[in-house]
């Protein structure tokens, strides 16, 4: 009879339609679909949520551990800040040396500034004197240009001839032999010849 019942049972497919063979023990579903079905039931009933006792125990233990570990860290940070706030002797010495050097530089700059101010005052006084001299020169009457012949007192204007003796003559009295010129032309010519033709002298023969 048992053999007949085994032969009569035909394998059935999964009731969810996934394509696998189902099992009557799992409500006609395959093993995968049955596990998913159980997970859905557990999630709907809230059985997956963790127990409150474990969460509360963890929440109580964690703050205690954090506070215990944070105390030495806070103390170490306070110690480090206090040590950093205390002035070191090396920094004090460096500050003193810098202040002394800055005071010396200030004194030298003041000493240098005094001669500079004196020089500026002297230059200002010189510049003040120069305009006064220029004004005095400008006040002097300009020399009148000679526009008349020295011999006949005729107005010559721009057509006058200025001689080397320093006088102006007309076209008639411009020659030196006419107005008895006092300029020494011979001496001037001799001087020019001396300058243009220097004397060339050979080296002296050294006697043995």
Swiss-Prot record:
The A20-type zinc finger domain mediates regulation of NF-kappa-B activity. This is AN1-type zinc finger protein 6. Residues 75-94 have a biased composition (Low complexity). SUPFAM superfamilies: AN1-like Zinc finger (SSF118310), Glucocorticoid receptor-like (DNA-binding domain) (SSF57716). Zn(2+) 3 binds at residues 163, 165, 179, 181. Zn(2+) 1 binds at residues 14, 18, 30, 33. Residues 41-140 are annotated as: Disordered.
């Amino acid at each position: 009879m048992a053999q007949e019942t085994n032969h009569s049972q035909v394998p059935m497919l999964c009731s969810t339609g996934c394509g696998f063979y189902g099992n009557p023990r799992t409500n006609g579903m395959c093993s995968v679909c049955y596990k998913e079905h159980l997970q859905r039931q557990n999630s709907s009933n809230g059985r997956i949520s963790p127990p409150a006792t474990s969460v509360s125990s963890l929440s109580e233990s964690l703050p205690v551990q954090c506070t215990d570990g944070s105390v030495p860290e806070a103390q170490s940070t306070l110690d480090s800040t206090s040590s950093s706030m205390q002035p070191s002797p090396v920094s004090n010495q460096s500050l003193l040396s810098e202040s002394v050097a800055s005071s010396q530089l200030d004194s030298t700059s003041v000493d240098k500034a005094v001669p500079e101010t004196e020089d500026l005052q002297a230059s200002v006084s010189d510049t003040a004197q120069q305009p006064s001299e220029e004004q005095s020169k400008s006040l002097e009457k300009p020399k009148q240009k000679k526009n008349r012949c020295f011999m006949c007192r005729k107005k010559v204007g721009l057509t006058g001839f200025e001689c080397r003796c320093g006088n102006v003559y007309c076209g008639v009295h411009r020659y030196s032999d006419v107005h008895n010129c006092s300029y020494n032309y011979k001496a001037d010519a001799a001087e020019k010849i001396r300058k243009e033709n220097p004397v060339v002298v050979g080296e002296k023969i050294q006697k043995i």
